[in-house]
Amino acid sequence: MEELQGYLEKDRSRQQHFLYPLLFQEYIYALAHNHGLNGSIFYEPVEVFGYDNKSSLVLVKRLITRIYQQNFLISLVNDSNQNRFVGYNHNNFFFSHFHSQMISESFAIIVEIPFSLRLVSYFEEKEIPKYHNLRSIHSIFPFLEDKLSHLNYVSDILIPHPIHMEILVQILQCWIQDVPFLHLLRFFLHEYHNLNSLLITQKKSIYVFSKENKRLFRFLYNSYVFEWEFFLVFIRKQSSYLRLTSYGXFLERTHFYEKIEHLQKKDFVVVCRNYFHRTLWFCKDPFMHYVRYQGKAILASKGTHLLMKKWKYHFFNFWQYYFHVWSQPYRIHINQLSNYSFYFMGYLSSLLLHFSAVRNQMLENSFLIDTITKKFDTIVPVIFLIGSLAKAKFCTVSGHPISKPIWTDLSDSDILNRFGRICRNLSHYHSGSSKKQGLYRIKYILRLSCARTLARKHKSTVRTFLRRLGSGLLEEFFTEEEQVLSLIFPKTTPFILHGSHRERIWYLDIIRINDLVNHS
Protein backbone atom coordinates (compact mmCIF):
# COMPACT_ATOMS: atom_id res chain seq x y z
CA MET A 1 0.00 0.00 0.00
CA GLU A 2 2.96 2.35 0.70
CA GLU A 3 4.24 1.71 -2.85
CA LEU A 4 0.86 2.68 -4.29
CA GLN A 5 0.68 5.90 -2.27
CA GLY A 6 4.23 6.79 -3.31
CA TYR A 7 3.38 6.23 -6.96
CA LEU A 8 0.33 8.47 -6.65
CA GLU A 9 2.37 11.24 -5.04
CA LYS A 10 4.99 10.95 -7.79
CA ASP A 11 2.41 11.18 -10.57
CA ARG A 12 0.34 13.94 -9.03
CA SER A 13 1.59 16.36 -11.69
CA ARG A 14 0.35 14.12 -14.53
CA GLN A 15 -2.87 12.72 -13.14
CA GLN A 16 -4.33 12.42 -16.62
CA HIS A 17 -2.28 9.29 -17.44
CA PHE A 18 -1.34 7.53 -14.23
CA LEU A 19 -3.79 4.61 -14.27
CA TYR A 20 -2.56 2.56 -17.23
CA PRO A 21 0.96 1.76 -15.87
CA LEU A 22 -0.57 0.38 -12.69
CA LEU A 23 -1.77 -2.67 -14.64
CA PHE A 24 1.87 -3.82 -14.80
CA GLN A 25 2.58 -3.50 -11.07
CA GLU A 26 2.57 -6.65 -8.96
CA TYR A 27 1.24 -4.97 -5.81
CA ILE A 28 -1.98 -4.02 -7.60
CA TYR A 29 -2.90 -7.68 -8.00
CA ALA A 30 -1.77 -8.45 -4.48
CA LEU A 31 -3.96 -5.60 -3.26
CA ALA A 32 -6.92 -6.91 -5.23
CA HIS A 33 -6.79 -10.36 -3.65
CA ASN A 34 -5.21 -9.82 -0.26
CA HIS A 35 -7.95 -9.98 2.35
CA GLY A 36 -5.73 -8.20 4.87
CA LEU A 37 -5.60 -5.02 2.78
CA ASN A 38 -9.30 -4.68 2.03
CA GLY A 39 -9.78 -1.87 4.54
CA SER A 40 -8.87 0.79 1.98
CA ILE A 41 -11.15 -0.65 -0.69
CA PHE A 42 -14.85 0.11 -0.94
CA TYR A 43 -16.19 -3.37 -1.55
CA GLU A 44 -15.73 -6.67 0.20
CA PRO A 45 -13.15 -9.04 -1.29
CA VAL A 46 -14.30 -11.40 -4.00
CA GLU A 47 -13.19 -15.00 -3.79
CA VAL A 48 -11.30 -16.24 -6.84
CA PHE A 49 -11.92 -19.67 -8.31
CA GLY A 50 -9.25 -22.05 -7.05
CA TYR A 51 -7.20 -19.19 -5.58
CA ASP A 52 -4.14 -20.31 -3.63
CA ASN A 53 -2.11 -17.84 -1.56
CA LYS A 54 1.08 -19.88 -1.97
CA SER A 55 1.07 -19.67 -5.76
CA SER A 56 -0.34 -16.15 -6.06
CA LEU A 57 2.98 -14.41 -6.66
CA VAL A 58 3.97 -16.88 -9.39
CA LEU A 59 0.60 -16.50 -11.11
CA VAL A 60 0.79 -12.72 -10.93
CA LYS A 61 4.24 -12.68 -12.54
CA ARG A 62 2.99 -15.02 -15.26
CA LEU A 63 -0.06 -12.83 -15.80
CA ILE A 64 1.99 -9.64 -16.17
CA THR A 65 4.29 -11.38 -18.63
CA ARG A 66 1.34 -12.51 -20.74
CA ILE A 67 -0.23 -9.03 -20.70
CA TYR A 68 2.76 -7.77 -22.69
CA GLN A 69 2.08 -10.39 -25.35
CA GLN A 70 0.03 -9.47 -28.39
CA ASN A 71 -3.66 -10.50 -28.52
CA PHE A 72 -3.50 -11.73 -24.93
CA LEU A 73 -7.03 -10.68 -24.00
CA ILE A 74 -8.57 -12.31 -27.08
CA SER A 75 -6.92 -15.67 -26.42
CA LEU A 76 -7.65 -15.36 -22.71
CA VAL A 77 -11.41 -14.91 -23.01
CA ASN A 78 -11.58 -17.32 -25.94
CA ASP A 79 -9.84 -20.09 -23.98
CA SER A 80 -12.04 -19.48 -20.97
CA ASN A 81 -15.18 -19.62 -23.09
CA GLN A 82 -14.22 -22.76 -24.99
CA ASN A 83 -13.10 -24.60 -21.89
CA ARG A 84 -16.37 -23.78 -20.19
CA PHE A 85 -18.54 -25.71 -22.63
CA VAL A 86 -16.19 -28.27 -24.18
CA GLY A 87 -14.17 -31.02 -22.55
CA TYR A 88 -11.25 -29.11 -21.10
CA ASN A 89 -8.02 -29.51 -19.27
CA HIS A 90 -8.56 -28.44 -15.67
CA ASN A 91 -5.23 -26.63 -15.39
CA ASN A 92 -5.80 -24.59 -18.56
CA PHE A 93 -9.27 -23.64 -17.40
CA PHE A 94 -7.92 -22.65 -13.99
CA PHE A 95 -5.24 -20.37 -15.42
CA SER A 96 -7.52 -18.74 -17.99
CA HIS A 97 -10.30 -18.21 -15.46
CA PHE A 98 -7.84 -16.98 -12.86
CA HIS A 99 -6.17 -14.53 -15.25
CA SER A 100 -9.49 -13.22 -16.51
CA GLN A 101 -10.75 -12.60 -13.00
CA MET A 102 -7.43 -11.10 -11.92
CA ILE A 103 -7.58 -8.57 -14.76
CA SER A 104 -11.19 -7.73 -13.96
CA GLU A 105 -10.33 -7.25 -10.29
CA SER A 106 -7.30 -5.11 -11.10
CA PHE A 107 -9.43 -2.90 -13.37
CA ALA A 108 -11.85 -2.38 -10.48
CA ILE A 109 -9.08 -1.64 -7.97
CA ILE A 110 -7.33 0.86 -10.23
CA VAL A 111 -10.45 2.68 -11.32
CA GLU A 112 -11.53 3.11 -7.69
CA ILE A 113 -8.33 4.98 -6.79
CA PRO A 114 -9.29 8.49 -8.05
CA PHE A 115 -12.72 8.26 -6.47
CA SER A 116 -11.39 7.03 -3.12
CA LEU A 117 -8.85 9.86 -2.98
CA ARG A 118 -11.53 12.36 -3.91
CA LEU A 119 -13.81 11.01 -1.17
CA VAL A 120 -11.12 11.20 1.50
CA SER A 121 -10.15 14.75 0.51
CA TYR A 122 -13.81 15.78 0.54
CA PHE A 123 -14.32 14.65 4.11
CA GLU A 124 -11.06 16.27 5.15
CA GLU A 125 -12.18 19.59 3.67
CA LYS A 126 -15.61 19.34 5.30
CA GLU A 127 -13.99 18.31 8.61
CA ILE A 128 -16.22 15.29 9.07
CA PRO A 129 -14.09 12.88 11.11
CA LYS A 130 -16.85 10.36 11.81
CA TYR A 131 -18.68 9.91 8.56
CA HIS A 132 -19.19 6.14 8.86
CA ASN A 133 -22.49 6.65 10.69
CA LEU A 134 -23.79 8.41 7.59
CA ARG A 135 -23.47 5.10 5.75
CA SER A 136 -25.81 3.29 8.13
CA ILE A 137 -28.75 1.63 6.42
CA HIS A 138 -30.99 2.46 9.36
CA SER A 139 -30.33 6.19 9.08
CA ILE A 140 -32.86 6.42 6.23
CA PHE A 141 -35.79 5.07 8.24
CA PRO A 142 -36.13 8.01 10.70
CA PHE A 143 -36.09 10.28 7.66
CA LEU A 144 -38.92 8.28 6.07
CA GLU A 145 -40.89 8.33 9.32
CA ASP A 146 -40.69 12.10 9.35
CA LYS A 147 -41.32 12.77 5.65
CA LEU A 148 -43.59 10.09 4.18
CA SER A 149 -46.44 10.82 6.56
CA HIS A 150 -46.91 14.19 4.81
CA LEU A 151 -46.77 12.88 1.22
CA ASN A 152 -49.47 11.54 -1.07
CA TYR A 153 -47.98 9.41 -3.86
CA VAL A 154 -45.00 7.13 -4.30
CA SER A 155 -43.39 5.76 -7.46
CA ASP A 156 -41.74 2.36 -7.11
CA ILE A 157 -38.94 2.40 -9.72
CA LEU A 158 -37.01 -0.58 -11.05
CA ILE A 159 -33.81 0.90 -12.50
CA PRO A 160 -33.09 -0.68 -15.92
CA HIS A 161 -29.70 -2.16 -16.74
CA PRO A 162 -27.78 -0.68 -19.68
CA ILE A 163 -27.94 -2.82 -22.80
CA HIS A 164 -24.30 -2.46 -23.85
CA MET A 165 -21.06 -2.08 -21.93
CA GLU A 166 -19.94 0.77 -24.17
CA ILE A 167 -22.45 3.02 -22.43
CA LEU A 168 -20.77 2.33 -19.10
CA VAL A 169 -17.33 3.14 -20.51
CA GLN A 170 -18.60 6.41 -21.99
CA ILE A 171 -19.97 7.41 -18.60
CA LEU A 172 -16.64 6.58 -16.98
CA GLN A 173 -14.85 8.62 -19.64
CA CYS A 174 -16.32 11.80 -18.15
CA TRP A 175 -14.48 11.12 -14.88
CA ILE A 176 -11.22 9.51 -15.99
CA GLN A 177 -9.07 11.05 -18.73
CA ASP A 178 -6.55 8.22 -19.00
CA VAL A 179 -7.07 7.25 -22.66
CA PRO A 180 -4.88 4.09 -22.77
CA PHE A 181 -6.55 2.69 -19.67
CA LEU A 182 -10.03 3.36 -21.05
CA HIS A 183 -9.10 1.81 -24.41
CA LEU A 184 -7.87 -1.34 -22.70
CA LEU A 185 -10.98 -1.51 -20.53
CA ARG A 186 -13.21 -1.01 -23.58
CA PHE A 187 -11.31 -3.69 -25.48
CA PHE A 188 -11.63 -6.16 -22.61
CA LEU A 189 -15.39 -5.57 -22.29
CA HIS A 190 -15.87 -5.66 -26.06
CA GLU A 191 -14.14 -9.01 -26.49
CA TYR A 192 -15.91 -10.44 -23.47
CA HIS A 193 -19.28 -9.36 -24.82
CA ASN A 194 -18.65 -10.61 -28.38
CA LEU A 195 -17.44 -14.04 -27.34
CA ASN A 196 -20.30 -14.53 -24.90
CA SER A 197 -22.88 -13.33 -27.42
CA LEU A 198 -22.23 -16.49 -29.45
CA LEU A 199 -23.53 -18.59 -26.58
CA ILE A 200 -26.08 -16.42 -24.75
CA THR A 201 -28.55 -13.69 -25.66
CA GLN A 202 -27.74 -10.02 -25.38
CA LYS A 203 -30.05 -9.54 -22.40
CA LYS A 204 -28.21 -12.20 -20.41
CA SER A 205 -24.77 -10.92 -21.37
CA ILE A 206 -24.67 -8.23 -18.70
CA TYR A 207 -26.17 -10.64 -16.18
CA VAL A 208 -23.37 -13.16 -16.80
CA PHE A 209 -20.77 -10.40 -16.65
CA SER A 210 -22.16 -9.15 -13.33
CA LYS A 211 -21.88 -12.65 -11.85
CA GLU A 212 -18.35 -13.38 -13.07
CA ASN A 213 -16.93 -9.86 -12.54
CA LYS A 214 -18.80 -8.60 -9.50
CA ARG A 215 -16.46 -5.87 -8.38
CA LEU A 216 -15.88 -4.25 -11.76
CA PHE A 217 -19.56 -4.45 -12.68
CA ARG A 218 -20.58 -2.89 -9.38
CA PHE A 219 -18.33 0.08 -9.99
CA LEU A 220 -19.53 0.57 -13.57
CA TYR A 221 -23.15 0.15 -12.52
CA ASN A 222 -22.78 2.70 -9.72
CA SER A 223 -21.32 5.17 -12.21
CA TYR A 224 -24.32 4.59 -14.45
CA VAL A 225 -26.76 5.12 -11.58
CA PHE A 226 -24.92 8.26 -10.51
CA GLU A 227 -25.32 9.65 -14.03
CA TRP A 228 -29.08 9.33 -14.07
CA GLU A 229 -29.35 10.56 -10.48
CA PHE A 230 -27.47 13.67 -11.57
CA PHE A 231 -30.30 14.24 -14.04
CA LEU A 232 -32.82 13.78 -11.23
CA VAL A 233 -31.03 16.27 -8.97
CA PHE A 234 -30.92 18.78 -11.82
CA ILE A 235 -34.67 18.60 -12.33
CA ARG A 236 -35.21 18.83 -8.59
CA LYS A 237 -33.15 22.02 -8.45
CA GLN A 238 -35.17 23.47 -11.30
CA SER A 239 -38.40 22.71 -9.47
CA SER A 240 -37.02 24.34 -6.32
CA TYR A 241 -36.08 27.39 -8.39
CA LEU A 242 -39.59 27.60 -9.84
CA ARG A 243 -41.10 27.36 -6.38
CA LEU A 244 -39.36 30.56 -5.32
CA THR A 245 -41.08 32.63 -8.01
CA SER A 246 -44.36 34.40 -7.42
CA TYR A 247 -46.35 32.52 -10.03
CA GLY A 248 -48.59 29.69 -8.93
CA UNK A 249 -48.02 27.31 -11.87
CA PHE A 250 -46.00 26.97 -15.03
CA LEU A 251 -47.44 25.57 -18.21
CA GLU A 252 -45.33 23.45 -20.48
CA ARG A 253 -44.66 24.38 -24.07
CA THR A 254 -47.11 22.87 -26.53
CA HIS A 255 -44.60 21.09 -28.75
CA PHE A 256 -42.19 19.89 -26.06
CA TYR A 257 -43.20 16.23 -26.33
CA GLU A 258 -42.89 16.39 -30.13
CA LYS A 259 -39.43 17.93 -29.94
CA ILE A 260 -38.06 15.46 -27.44
CA GLU A 261 -38.78 12.51 -29.74
CA HIS A 262 -36.19 13.77 -32.26
CA LEU A 263 -33.45 14.67 -29.81
CA GLN A 264 -30.16 12.85 -29.77
CA LYS A 265 -28.20 12.18 -26.60
CA LYS A 266 -26.07 15.34 -26.53
CA ASP A 267 -28.88 17.59 -27.72
CA PHE A 268 -31.13 16.25 -25.00
CA VAL A 269 -28.61 17.20 -22.32
CA VAL A 270 -28.30 20.71 -23.77
CA VAL A 271 -32.07 21.12 -23.72
CA CYS A 272 -32.19 19.89 -20.14
CA ARG A 273 -29.59 22.34 -18.95
CA ASN A 274 -30.61 25.42 -20.87
CA TYR A 275 -34.37 25.30 -21.36
CA PHE A 276 -35.80 23.13 -18.61
CA HIS A 277 -37.32 26.04 -16.73
CA ARG A 278 -39.31 26.94 -19.86
CA THR A 279 -40.34 23.52 -21.07
CA LEU A 280 -41.22 21.51 -17.98
CA TRP A 281 -44.27 22.01 -15.89
CA PHE A 282 -44.06 21.86 -12.11
CA CYS A 283 -46.68 22.33 -9.46
CA LYS A 284 -46.51 25.19 -7.03
CA ASP A 285 -45.55 22.89 -4.17
CA PRO A 286 -43.56 19.92 -5.55
CA PHE A 287 -42.11 18.30 -2.42
CA MET A 288 -40.03 15.38 -3.63
CA HIS A 289 -38.07 12.71 -1.77
CA TYR A 290 -35.88 10.13 -3.49
CA VAL A 291 -34.35 6.97 -2.00
CA ARG A 292 -32.36 4.32 -3.90
CA TYR A 293 -31.59 0.83 -2.65
CA GLN A 294 -29.96 -1.98 -4.65
CA GLY A 295 -31.46 -1.84 -8.15
CA LYS A 296 -34.64 -0.08 -7.09
CA ALA A 297 -35.66 3.43 -6.11
CA ILE A 298 -38.58 5.22 -4.49
CA LEU A 299 -39.76 8.67 -5.50
CA ALA A 300 -42.38 10.12 -3.14
CA SER A 301 -44.24 13.38 -3.68
CA LYS A 302 -46.86 15.60 -2.13
CA GLY A 303 -48.09 16.53 -5.58
CA THR A 304 -50.89 15.13 -7.68
CA HIS A 305 -51.11 11.94 -9.69
CA LEU A 306 -50.58 13.99 -12.88
CA LEU A 307 -47.23 15.23 -11.59
CA MET A 308 -46.09 11.67 -10.88
CA LYS A 309 -47.07 10.62 -14.41
CA LYS A 310 -44.94 13.43 -15.83
CA TRP A 311 -41.95 12.30 -13.77
CA LYS A 312 -42.52 8.80 -15.12
CA TYR A 313 -42.61 10.10 -18.69
CA HIS A 314 -39.38 12.07 -18.28
CA PHE A 315 -37.60 9.05 -16.79
CA PHE A 316 -38.59 6.91 -19.77
CA ASN A 317 -37.36 9.51 -22.24
CA PHE A 318 -34.10 10.04 -20.39
CA TRP A 319 -33.33 6.31 -20.27
CA GLN A 320 -34.22 5.92 -23.93
CA TYR A 321 -32.37 8.89 -25.46
CA TYR A 322 -29.41 9.18 -23.10
CA PHE A 323 -28.67 5.55 -22.21
CA HIS A 324 -30.37 3.90 -25.23
CA VAL A 325 -32.43 1.76 -22.87
CA TRP A 326 -36.00 0.94 -23.82
CA SER A 327 -37.77 0.73 -20.47
CA GLN A 328 -41.13 -0.97 -20.09
CA PRO A 329 -43.98 0.76 -18.22
CA TYR A 330 -44.03 -1.94 -15.54
CA ARG A 331 -40.69 -0.64 -14.24
CA ILE A 332 -42.40 2.35 -12.61
CA HIS A 333 -45.54 1.91 -10.52
CA ILE A 334 -47.40 4.93 -9.16
CA ASN A 335 -49.39 4.26 -6.01
CA GLN A 336 -51.17 6.26 -3.36
CA LEU A 337 -49.28 6.00 -0.09
CA SER A 338 -52.37 5.48 2.03
CA ASN A 339 -53.29 2.32 0.07
CA TYR A 340 -49.88 0.85 -0.68
CA SER A 341 -47.34 -1.38 1.05
CA PHE A 342 -43.87 -1.74 -0.42
CA TYR A 343 -40.88 -3.94 0.32
CA PHE A 344 -38.06 -1.59 1.25
CA MET A 345 -34.57 -2.59 2.43
CA GLY A 346 -35.65 -5.70 4.28
CA TYR A 347 -38.86 -4.24 5.69
CA LEU A 348 -42.48 -4.26 4.57
CA SER A 349 -43.29 -0.56 4.85
CA SER A 350 -46.64 1.17 4.69
CA LEU A 351 -48.45 4.31 5.81
CA LEU A 352 -51.09 3.57 8.43
CA LEU A 353 -54.10 5.81 9.01
CA HIS A 354 -55.28 6.16 12.60
CA PHE A 355 -58.79 7.52 13.14
CA SER A 356 -59.57 9.07 16.50
CA ALA A 357 -62.19 11.33 18.02
CA VAL A 358 -61.29 14.32 20.15
CA ARG A 359 -63.83 15.89 22.48
CA ASN A 360 -63.78 19.66 22.33
CA GLN A 361 -65.56 21.77 24.93
CA MET A 362 -66.47 25.41 24.48
CA LEU A 363 -68.30 26.95 27.43
CA GLU A 364 -71.37 24.79 27.97
CA ASN A 365 -71.25 23.07 24.60
CA SER A 366 -69.12 20.03 23.79
CA PHE A 367 -68.68 18.24 20.49
CA LEU A 368 -66.51 15.52 18.92
CA ILE A 369 -63.94 16.16 16.20
CA ASP A 370 -62.78 13.26 14.03
CA THR A 371 -59.04 13.38 13.35
CA ILE A 372 -56.83 11.31 11.06
CA THR A 373 -53.14 10.79 11.77
CA LYS A 374 -50.63 9.09 9.48
CA LYS A 375 -47.84 6.87 10.77
CA PHE A 376 -45.01 5.23 8.87
CA ASP A 377 -45.03 1.55 9.82
CA THR A 378 -42.39 -1.14 9.28
CA ILE A 379 -42.83 -4.85 9.91
CA VAL A 380 -40.71 -7.94 9.35
CA PRO A 381 -41.49 -9.62 5.99
CA VAL A 382 -41.74 -13.15 7.34
CA ILE A 383 -42.43 -14.76 3.96
CA PHE A 384 -39.33 -13.22 2.37
CA LEU A 385 -37.12 -14.19 5.31
CA ILE A 386 -38.42 -17.76 5.33
CA GLY A 387 -37.68 -17.90 1.61
CA SER A 388 -34.09 -16.78 2.28
CA LEU A 389 -33.74 -19.34 5.06
CA ALA A 390 -35.12 -22.05 2.77
CA LYS A 391 -32.69 -21.07 0.02
CA ALA A 392 -29.83 -21.32 2.51
CA LYS A 393 -31.09 -24.79 3.61
CA PHE A 394 -32.09 -23.81 7.16
CA CYS A 395 -35.73 -24.78 6.68
CA THR A 396 -38.24 -25.93 4.11
CA VAL A 397 -40.28 -23.58 1.95
CA SER A 398 -43.15 -23.86 4.45
CA GLY A 399 -40.85 -22.83 7.33
CA HIS A 400 -40.17 -26.24 8.89
CA PRO A 401 -36.65 -26.21 10.44
CA ILE A 402 -34.13 -28.70 9.06
CA SER A 403 -30.51 -29.51 9.82
CA LYS A 404 -27.52 -28.05 8.02
CA PRO A 405 -25.55 -31.15 6.87
CA ILE A 406 -22.67 -29.17 5.39
CA TRP A 407 -21.83 -27.79 8.85
CA THR A 408 -21.74 -31.12 10.69
CA ASP A 409 -17.97 -31.38 10.14
CA LEU A 410 -17.43 -28.24 12.24
CA SER A 411 -16.96 -28.17 15.98
CA ASP A 412 -19.92 -27.52 18.28
CA SER A 413 -18.66 -24.04 19.11
CA ASP A 414 -18.29 -23.13 15.43
CA ILE A 415 -21.82 -24.33 14.70
CA LEU A 416 -23.20 -22.30 17.60
CA ASN A 417 -21.20 -19.24 16.53
CA ARG A 418 -22.46 -19.40 12.95
CA PHE A 419 -26.10 -19.78 13.92
CA GLY A 420 -25.66 -17.17 16.63
CA ARG A 421 -24.13 -14.65 14.25
CA ILE A 422 -27.00 -15.03 11.79
CA CYS A 423 -29.59 -14.77 14.54
CA ARG A 424 -27.99 -11.69 16.11
CA ASN A 425 -27.59 -9.97 12.74
CA LEU A 426 -31.25 -10.52 11.87
CA SER A 427 -32.38 -9.39 15.31
CA HIS A 428 -30.13 -6.34 15.13
CA TYR A 429 -31.20 -5.37 11.63
CA HIS A 430 -34.94 -5.88 12.19
CA SER A 431 -35.02 -4.09 15.53
CA GLY A 432 -37.01 -1.33 13.84
CA SER A 433 -40.02 -3.55 13.27
CA SER A 434 -43.22 -2.48 15.00
CA LYS A 435 -44.31 -6.11 15.39
CA LYS A 436 -41.83 -8.65 16.67
CA GLN A 437 -43.97 -11.80 16.33
CA GLY A 438 -42.60 -12.54 12.86
CA LEU A 439 -39.03 -12.06 14.09
CA TYR A 440 -39.66 -14.51 16.94
CA ARG A 441 -40.69 -17.11 14.36
CA ILE A 442 -37.45 -16.61 12.43
CA LYS A 443 -35.46 -17.00 15.65
CA TYR A 444 -37.34 -20.20 16.44
CA ILE A 445 -36.47 -21.64 13.02
CA LEU A 446 -32.78 -20.85 13.50
CA ARG A 447 -32.73 -22.22 17.04
CA LEU A 448 -34.35 -25.51 16.06
CA SER A 449 -32.19 -25.77 12.93
CA CYS A 450 -29.11 -25.38 15.13
CA ALA A 451 -30.39 -28.10 17.47
CA ARG A 452 -31.08 -30.46 14.56
CA THR A 453 -27.61 -29.81 13.13
CA LEU A 454 -25.91 -30.59 16.45
CA ALA A 455 -28.09 -33.67 16.95
CA ARG A 456 -27.25 -34.92 13.47
CA LYS A 457 -23.56 -34.43 14.12
CA HIS A 458 -23.73 -36.48 17.33
CA LYS A 459 -26.09 -39.04 15.71
CA SER A 460 -28.87 -38.41 18.19
CA THR A 461 -32.36 -36.94 18.29
CA VAL A 462 -33.04 -33.33 19.17
CA ARG A 463 -34.91 -34.23 22.35
CA THR A 464 -32.18 -36.58 23.56
CA PHE A 465 -29.44 -34.11 22.71
CA LEU A 466 -31.11 -31.21 24.53
CA ARG A 467 -31.98 -33.40 27.50
CA ARG A 468 -28.33 -34.45 27.83
CA LEU A 469 -26.76 -30.99 27.44
CA GLY A 470 -29.63 -28.79 28.59
CA SER A 471 -31.68 -26.21 26.73
CA GLY A 472 -29.38 -23.44 27.95
CA LEU A 473 -26.87 -24.48 25.32
CA LEU A 474 -28.85 -22.64 22.65
CA GLU A 475 -29.61 -19.54 24.70
CA GLU A 476 -26.14 -18.02 24.45
CA PHE A 477 -26.65 -16.89 20.85
CA PHE A 478 -30.24 -15.75 21.39
CA THR A 479 -30.11 -12.04 22.29
CA GLU A 480 -33.48 -10.72 23.39
CA GLU A 481 -34.60 -7.15 22.78
CA GLU A 482 -35.03 -6.67 26.53
CA GLN A 483 -31.28 -7.14 27.02
CA VAL A 484 -30.51 -4.59 24.32
CA LEU A 485 -33.01 -2.11 25.67
CA SER A 486 -31.68 -2.53 29.20
CA LEU A 487 -28.31 -1.29 27.93
CA ILE A 488 -29.80 1.65 26.04
CA PHE A 489 -32.43 2.66 28.59
CA PRO A 490 -31.09 2.22 32.15
CA LYS A 491 -33.18 1.95 35.28
CA THR A 492 -34.54 5.47 34.82
CA THR A 493 -37.24 4.10 32.48
CA PRO A 494 -38.18 0.66 33.78
CA PHE A 495 -41.62 0.74 32.20
CA ILE A 496 -40.31 0.66 28.65
CA LEU A 497 -39.14 -2.93 28.90
CA HIS A 498 -42.69 -4.08 29.47
CA GLY A 499 -43.69 -3.09 25.94
CA SER A 500 -40.36 -3.68 24.29
CA HIS A 501 -41.94 -5.89 21.64
CA ARG A 502 -43.57 -2.74 20.26
CA GLU A 503 -40.55 -0.43 20.49
CA ARG A 504 -38.60 0.39 17.35
CA ILE A 505 -34.88 1.05 17.48
CA TRP A 506 -32.75 2.25 14.58
CA TYR A 507 -29.00 1.66 14.81
CA LEU A 508 -26.27 3.75 13.20
CA ASP A 509 -23.68 0.98 12.90
CA ILE A 510 -25.36 -1.17 10.23
CA ILE A 511 -23.54 -0.75 6.92
CA ARG A 512 -24.90 -3.84 5.20
CA ILE A 513 -26.85 -7.00 5.93
CA ASN A 514 -25.30 -10.24 4.76
CA ASP A 515 -27.31 -12.39 2.44
CA LEU A 516 -28.20 -15.65 4.14
CA VAL A 517 -27.09 -17.51 1.03
CA ASN A 518 -23.49 -16.57 1.82
CA HIS A 519 -23.65 -18.71 4.96
CA SER A 520 -24.37 -21.89 3.04
UniProtKB/Swiss-Prot annotation:
Entry superkingdom: Eukaryota
UniProt gene name: matK
Known role: Usually encoded in the trnK tRNA gene intron. Probably assists in splicing its own and other chloroplast group II introns.
Pfam family, one: MatK_N
Compartment(s): Plastid, Chloroplast
Name of the protein in question: Maturase K
Annotated GO CC locations: chloroplast
A Gene Ontology molecular function term of the record: RNA binding
InterPro entries in the record: Domain_X, Maturase_MatK, Maturase_MatK_N
Predominant subcellular localization, coarse grouping: plastid
GO terms of biological process kind: mRNA processing; RNA splicing; tRNA processing
Family, as annotated: Belongs to the intron maturase 2 family. MatK subfamily.
Coiled coil: none
Keyword tags: Chloroplast, mRNA processing, Plastid, RNA-binding, tRNA processing
